[in-house]
Amino acid sequence: MASRGVNKVILVGNLGQDPEVRYMPSGGAVANLTLATSESWRDKQTGEMKEQTEWHRVVMFGKLAEVAGEYLRKGSQVYIEGQLRTRKWTDQSGQERYTTEINVPQIGGVMQMLGGRQGGGAPAGGQQQGGWGQPQQPQQPQGGNQFSGGAQSRPQQSAPAPSNEPPMDFDDDIPF
């Protein structure tokens, strides 16, 4: 069997704004996200730390789009698996335009929320938040934060053991 190629995109990044969810005439949900990924390195000549941020357009469909609209907010960290797609349209002046997006279909696409819940609520996984110095019992993984379109099922990974360190403040690390 001849291989026709592989079109798979995996991103881990932070949302630049709240997802925009719309519904098609058929009733299916579509969510548009803007995802930032950053990489940093040390300049060999100056020794200075450099950083480059890439912005990605992500389009989700179906239940994944609904979940994204309900739970993701600006700054949320998320893992995305999808496919690279370029689409063409004609703008109001009659000029053809192109855009390249990461397409996360309802079947075969994956979206997993990373980090804790934004805006105060209980931490992800339903753990009770204790003091930083108090020992905590490991919780059984509750799931509920990984969503896939259903084409493939992945084994649930166990949550990392709680540490005695204070939670990290990711707001300082977000480039927007």
Curated annotation (Swiss-Prot):
The UniProt record lists the keyword Cytoplasm: no
Biased composition (Low complexity): 134-150
Biased composition (Polar residues): 151-161
Disordered as annotated region, ranges: 111-176
SUPFAM superfamilies per UniProt: Nucleic acid-binding proteins
BP-aspect Gene Ontology terms: DNA recombination; DNA repair; DNA replication
Role according to the record: Plays an important role in DNA replication, recombination and repair. Binds to ssDNA and to an array of partner proteins to recruit them to their sites of action during DNA metabolism.
Name by which UniProt lists this protein: Single-stranded DNA-binding protein 1
Organism: Salmonella typhimurium (strain LT2 / SGSC1412 / ATCC 700720)
